[in-house]
Structures are given as structure tokens and as C-alpha cells.
Swiss-Prot record:
PANTHER family in alphabetical order: RNA HELICASE (PTHR24031)
Family recorded in the similarity comment: Belongs to the DEAD box helicase family. DDX24/MAK5 subfamily.
Stretches with biased composition (Basic and acidic residues): 137-161
GO CC term (a single one): nucleolus
Known function: ATP-binding RNA helicase involved in the biogenesis of 60S ribosomal subunits and is required for the normal formation of 25S and 5.8S rRNAs.
Record remark on domains: The Q motif is unique to and characteristic of the DEAD box family of RNA helicases and controls ATP binding and hydrolysis.
One Pfam family here: DEAD
The protein, known as: ATP-dependent RNA helicase MAK5
Lineage of source species: Eukaryota, Fungi, Dikarya, Ascomycota, Pezizomycotina
This enzyme's EC code(s): 3.6.4.13
Length: 760
């Protein structure tokens, strides 16, 4: 009987009692990770404090030295006492084994449960048991997930490094073998004494011969001298300092650098290149990467500019060989890390591109902070060490004359500074390794490119939009860059010209970084033979190397002469030709005269010495006024439509701001009362009234204006052709019959712009 009862009991236990007990065990195991550890008050001396590193560039610490920090501790103030509460028990470190929880009241139940669980591993499993077994403690599942994740991550990193080695090794060598026949003849580069790897990369870039600035500066830089290089825009200044930097990197033992990174230390970059604008920094990065693309092993080049992730840039700087950046973001990253600023003090090259802009008075304070941080005196146990002693300083720009930075408008002395005065100005701003750096000026007579033709269009102040549209229509298949002095002008001109069905792209400093890069990419990716127009502020004036820009139009007279030089330098780059047109209003005559006098003073002086009467440097562009007057109605309609859209957006933003401010103050907001109170007849009242009229324009009125404009754009402008006798030879009849697009009916050669490109 005993045996039968025991068998019956076991059957009952297996069918009825096992599942509740199993739930109980699993419930207990499930509840253990959720249970919070008891907190306890500990003494401050028993905590694991660690010292805080204070940045070296911290000017005034005011006694904040020897700081220490601790993590995972709550600070509670109890009256006048401060208590430190931690959740980590002290016995947790000492006893690593299982904790003794006492004897269980039913010790056999756990063994039975374990036995049943062992049996339940057979294929036939009840549904309830499957569900219960899938439920595991969160802590255990988390640990199980973390371990394979870390292992996979390590495997990916190792495989990635192996793949990179293969890619930069064998595949790069194969690519080099395949592309040797496609390269250009680089025999003229041989006198510069470059390595075979660099010569091969130059051949793949198809640069047959060095430019004047490259031939003059590369040997001096390779010899270890500090160099100040001056050359016209588009003369290849980027490779003038990029080639020696890569040569130096190739000569340095790469195994030492890889070992240093493997030990967890921050890598010391070989070169730091400073740029005034983000677009120029990204362009410099691309040019150096293109130079290194043909090498078997290439340096890691990274750009540090605003508008992108700071944390990602910090990670890139720790392994970078060549750093290109703007002063603001670069100083933000360097000043936050003591290791980075110490590593950057060991750079071999400091390059300042567009130095006249970076070193101008009242601008780029961060650049000054970077120079001081690199030259900061360190006091060690062994003695005093000055950082950055061994580095070369390379300075490049198209304009070094300090007099070109003076404003053209207003009263004041407009005398030109000499080369010696400009050099003294640079010596004050930068600390060169040599007492007097090598000053190389390959075009001392003129700052303008040789293939550039300059023209001026005189018009009324209120007709600039009309003449700008006329000039753009006269270049239907050319890539045009329009410069303005203000962001508001870019925002106004872009929608107006878009209403006139022109492919217009905007670029200014208040756009987010991705939008700025997208605008430059869209402008550069336009097909040759198709019109592409970029309206930009001076952010696009310096350094941007966009091939195929045929015409540069200055909507406003630049504020300074050096801005005009760099704006005009976006065209006629290298050996190509280009056209720079200045739209001048009557009130801009005085600044224009000063501009021409400053930019072409050296060329005029040289002409007088030779006994010549002095040539005309800026030609007057005579447009056909009849054709311009026929375009007036188009421009007026497009301007009304664009102004209405902008006024509604602007007033909507102002209303939102005023309404939000009124809500924060707890005041009732009534826009009509504010408008009545703000009505005045003083300066600016006319502009306010026009904005109000544009805002009150209804959708039906805007649609009517768009319909009128569409009808006008569908018709061609008659350039003097008798429409009764259209086949007299002045009209392309085949083009009309085939439906070819065009804005003019008749020939447009006599408009006064094209002959400038052919004049000498």
C-alpha cells in the first residue's frame, strides 16, 4: 500500500503540484533582479574618489585645484549635516560566492522541480511549460545579450581593420597598376624632388606641370622653411602645401604611430590646416584625400567644422593625421580635452589658408586662442618646455595687403600698405619658427587672374533686379555665381528669380550645414551646357574651387577690395577665362572708384613706369536698353509674387514671437492694436506699408499674377525682328519649327557682354 500511495502522490505531484511550485521558483527568481539593493550611509573617506583633470587652458581657476569626483553616490543634506548614501553593499566585494539564505521549509520540492525540469527537456513539452521557460530574469538575458554583442563588435572591428589593410595594400596596388597608363606626363615635376608615390598620385590627377606658386613654394617647404605664399585665385595653393605635408607623412615611421594608438594614447597629427569657412574646409579635405587616393597607405584626413556632430569629430581627432577645420568648432573641441591640446602641440605643420581673413582685426577670436594654446608654455619636473617649437608655419592667400581690408564706403585715409608693413602685421599675429619667413609672391603686379575680364553695368538703384535678370538671360547656358552683401538680399532674390523659371540656388551662413553642402553639390553637379545660378553671400567668396563658373556678378559693390578679389577669383581659375560684372548704382560710384584704384594700383604704376598711358582695367558693359525695358513687366510681376510670400512668412514669424512673449508675460495680445500704435511717418514707414500691402494680398490675386507672368514667359522677346518678314535671316527658323527653347526672337550677339571675353 505504501508503494501505491507514493506512486499516486508522485503522479499527483507531477500533474498538479509541479507547475505551481515551478511558478513559485521562477517567480522568486524573477523578483530577485527587481529587488532594489538597500542603501546605506557611508563615510566620505571610504568612497573611491578619483581626481579631476583641469584643462590647461583654464585661465583663472580661483582655487578649484585638486578636485575629486565619485559616481553612484547620492548626497543628502540633513539639517547641517551632509550624508553620502550608496546602494552598493560592502560585503558584495568580499564574498563572491552564493549567499546563504537559510534552510527551506520544503527542501524536497526544489529537487523534485529540478528533476521534472530535467525531464521536461524532452521533445514533448506542454504549452504552459514552454511559455514559462521562455520567461527569464531580465538581468540574465541582458548579460547574455551583451556578451555576444561585444564579441560581434570586436569581430567586426578586427575584420574591418583586416579589410582596410587589404584594401589599402593589394587592391590599391592593383588599381595603381591598372591606372598607370591613364596618368599624365609628370616629367616637369621631377626638379621638385618628390617621391615616386607622390609623382604617381599627381599623374593620376593629370596635373602635367606645377603652377608658379607650387614650383616656388614646394622646395622651400620641403627644406624646412616657414613660407608665406601669395598667388592669385585658382593658382593651386592647396597642393602647394598639401604635397609637402603628405611627403612628410610618408617619411615618418608608420609603425610608431600605430603602436601609439594601440596603447590607447591620442595620436599626434602631423598637420593642422585652418580655414575661414566651412565650405572651404570641406573642399581642402577633399583635395588632400584625392591626392592621397593613389597611395598604398594614406594618412587619415578629417574635417572639423560646425553644424556636424561634436562627439564624432572628437573620435576622429584621436586618430587623425591631417586635420582641416574652422577656428570656432576646432577650438570648441580642443579646449574641452587636455589630451587633444597636448597632442596638437606636437604637430609638424601649421597651415593658415586665406590668412588675411583669419587674421583680420576683430574677427576669428578662436583662431587667436588656438595659436596661444599651441604655443602655451608647459612646466614639467624636468624644466620648461614650449609647445610647438619644431613646427613649420605656412601662410597662403591671394591678398596680404592690409589696405585692401579697409572699407570702401565712408570717409577715411585710403592709402595702400606696403609689403613690408603687411609682413610686420603677419609677424605680430603668428609665431614663426624662423625670424623672417620666406615670402613668395608669384604675381606682385596684380591680384587678379590673367584670364579674367572685368565689366561694370551702370543702372538705377531700383533697377538692379531688372539688369540682373537681363544679364542672366544673356547667359542661358553658362554657370553663374551672383554675390550679394546681405542674407536678406539672397532670400529676396532667390524666390523672385525662381518665379521667372531660372534654376536658382541659395547659399548663406544662416542655412544649416547640410543645406549649405546640398546647395554647393547641386550647383556643381549641373550638366555642362545647362544654366545653373548660385546666389550667395561672401561665404562662397573664398577658396571654393567650382569648375566651370563662367560669370561672376556682383549685385552689390563689395564692402572691401579684398572681397572683390576673392569673389572674382571664383571664375577664370587655372588657365581658363572668365567674366566679372559689377552692377553699380549712382550712390555706389565713390566706392567703385576706390575699389578699382586699390585693386589695380600696382598694375597702373607699372604701366606708368613703362611710359604707357595706363590701360582700362574695368570695361563698361553697354546693354540694349530696348530689350531691358521689354523685360521690366516680367520682373515686376515676379517681384510682387515673391514679396507677398516673404511678407506673409515674416509677419507670421513676428506674430508668433509676439504672441509667445505675451503669453509668458500674462498679457493679452492684439496684433491690430500693435499695428495702430506702430504707425508712424518717419524713416522706414514706406517699407512697412509695402510689407503690409504684400501681406494683405489674397490667394486669388497671387494666382492672377502668376497667370499673367506665365503668359509673358511663354512669349519670346523680340530683339528687333520684323515679325511680318521673319525669314529675313535674323531668326533661326529651324529652331522655331523644332520647338527649341529660347527667350529672344532674333540674334543676341550685339548685347555688349560677349565681346569682353575676346578683348585683350
Amino acid at each position: 500500500m505504501t508503494t501505491d500511495t507514493t506512486k499516486q502522490k508522485r503522479k499527483l505531484d507531477s500533474k498538479q503540484n509541479t507547475s505551481p511550485k515551478r511558478r513559485k521558483v521562477q517567480a522568486n527568481g524573477k523578483a530577485q533582479p527587481k529587488a532594489k539593493k538597500p542603501k546605506r550611509v557611508v563615510a566620505a573617506d571610504s568612497l573611491s574618489w578619483r581626481s579631476v583633470e583641469i584643462p590647461e587652458l583654464f585661465d583663472d581657476a580661483e582655487g578649484f585645484f585638486g578636485l575629486e569626483e565619485v559616481e553612484g553616490v547620492d548626497v543628502i543634506r540633513d539639517g547641517g549635516m551632509v550624508k553620502f548614501v550608496t546602494a552598493a553593499p560592502a560585503a558584495e566585494k568580499e564574498d563572491e560566492g552564493d549567499d546563504f539564505s537559510g534552510f527551506d521549509d520544503n527542501p524536497e520540492s526544489t529537487s523534485l522541480v529540478a528533476a521534472e525540469e530535467a525531464k521536461s527537456e524532452e521533445p514533448a513539452k506542454p504549452q504552459s511549460q514552454k511559455k514559462q521557460q521562455t520567461k527569464q530574469p531580465k538581468s540574465e538575458t541582458k548579460e547574455k545579450k551583451e556578451k555576444p554583442a561585444k564579441a560581434k563588435k570586436n569581430e567586426k572591428q578586427t575584420s574591418k581593420t583586416d579589410d582596410d589593410d587589404l584594401a589599402t595594400g593589394s587592391f590599391a596596388a592593383l588599381a595603381e597598376i591598372d591606372e598607370t597608363d591613364e596618368g599624365a606626363d609628370v616629367s616637369e615635376w621631377e626638379p621638385l624632388g618628390l617621391s615616386e608615390e607622390i609623382m604617381s598620385s599627381i599623374a593620376k590627377l593629370k596635373f602635367a606641370k606645377p603652377t608658379a606658386i607650387q614650383a616656388a613654394t614646394i622646395p622651400e617647404i620641403l627644406a624646412g622653411h616657414d613660407v608665406v605664399g601669395k598667388a592669385s585665385t585658382g593658382s593651386g595653393k592647396t597642393l602647394a602645401f598639401g604635397i609637402p605635408i603628405v611627403e612628410k607623412w610618408l617619411s615618418i615611421n608608420a609603425s610608431t604611430q600605430s603602436k601609439r594608438v594601440a596603447e590607447g594614447e591620442t595620436k599626434t597629427p602631423i598637420a593642422l590646416v585652418l580655414s575661414p569657412t566651412r565650405e572651404l574646409a570641406h573642399q581642402l579635405t577633399d583635395h588632400i584625400k584625392n591626392l592621397c587616393a593613389g597611395l598604398a597607405t594614406s594618412p587619415y584626413v578629417c574635417s572639423v567644422t560646425g553644424g556636424l556632430s561634436v562627439h564624432k569629430q572628437q573620435r576622429q581627432l584621436e586618430k587623425a593625421d591631417i586635420v582641416v577645420g574652422t577656428p570656432g568648432r576646432l577650438w570648441e573641441v580642443l579646449s574641452s580635452s587636455t589630451k587633444l591640446i597636448q597632442a596638437f602641440r606636437g604637430i609638424k605643420f601649421l597651415v593658415v589658408d586665406e590668412a588675411d581673413r583669419l587674421l583680420s582685426e576683430g574677427h576669428f577670436k578662436d583662431a587667436k586662442d588656438i595659436f596661444e594654446g599651441l604655443d602655451k608654455v608647459e612646466t614639467d619636473d624636468d624644466g620648461i618646455i614650449r609647445g610647438g617649437k619644431a613646427r613649420q608655419t605656412l601662410v597662403f592667400s591671394a591678398t596680404f595687403n592690409k589696405g585692401l581690408q579697409q572699407k570702401l564706403a565712408g570717409k577715411g585715409r585710403f592709402d595702400l600698405a606696403t609689403d613690408s608693413q603687411s609682413m610686420e602685421y603677419l609677424l605680430k599675429k603668428l609665431k614663426f619658427r624662423e625670424e623672417i619667413p620666406k615670402f613668395i609672391d608669384v604675381n606682385p603686379v596684380s591680384q587678379m587672374a590673367e584670364g579674367l575680364k572685368e565689366g561694370i553695368v551702370e543702372c538705377g538703384a531700383m533697377e538692379k533686379d531688372l539688369y540682373l535678370y537681363s544679364l542672366l538671360l544673356m547667359h542661358p547656358t553658362q554657370r553663374t555665381l551672383v554675390f550679394t552683401n546681405s542674407i536678406s538680399s539672397v532670400r529676396r532674390l532667390t524666390p523672385m528669380l525662381q518665379q521667372l523659371t531660372l534654376p536658382v540656388i541659395a547659399l548663406h551662413s544662416q542655412m544649416i550645414q547640410k543645406a549649405r553642402l546640398r546647395s554647393v553639390e547641386r550647383f556643381t553637379s549641373s550638366k555642362p551646357g545647362s544654366a545653373s545660378i548660385l546666389i550667395a553671400t561672401d561665404v562662397a567668396a573664398r577658396g571654393l574651387d567650382i569648375r566651370g563658373i563662367d560669370v561672376v556678378i556682383h549685385y552689390h559693390v563689395p564692402r572691401t577690395a579684398d572681397a572683390y578679389v576673392h569673389r572674382s577669383g571664383r571664375t577664370a581659375r587655372a588657365d581658363s577665362s572668365g567674366l566679372s560684372i559689377l552692377i553699380c548704382a549712382p550712390e555706389e560710384v565713390t566706392p567703385t572708384r576706390r575699389l578699382v584704384a586699390k585693386v589695380h594700383a600696382s598694375a597702373a604704376a607699372k604701366g606708368k613706369k613703362k611710359g604707357s598711358a595706363g590701360g582700362v582695367f574695368v570695361h563698361s558693359v553697354e546693354l540694349d536698353r530696348r530689350l531691358v525695358s521689354k523685360l521690366r513687366e516680367r520682373v515686376q510681376l515676379a517681384k510682387q509674387i515673391a514679396d507677398s510670400t516673404l511678407a506673409k512668412e515674416k509677419i507670421g514669424k513676428e506674430d508668433n514671437w509676439m504672441q509667445k512673449a505675451a503669453e509668458e508675460l500674462g498679457v493679452e495680445y492684439d496684433s491690430e492694436d500693435l499695428e495702430k500704435a506702430s504707425n508712424w511717418s518717419g524713416r522706414g514707414s514706406g517699407r512697412k506699408s509695402k510689407q503690409k500691402e504684400a501681406k494683405e494680398m489674397s490667394k486669388a490675386e497671387v494666382a492672377s499674377l502668376k497667370a499673367q507672368l506665365k503668359q509673358l514667359l511663354s512669349k519670346r522677346i523680340n530683339s528687333g525682328v520684323n515679325e511680318r518678314y521673319i525669314a529675313n535671316g535674323n531668326v533661326d527658323i529651324d529652331g522655331l519649327l523644332s520647338g527649341a527653347k529660347g527667350d529672344f526672337l532674333g540674334k543676341v550677339e550685339g548685347l555688349g557682354v560677349s565681346p569682353l571675353l575676346a578683348t585683350d
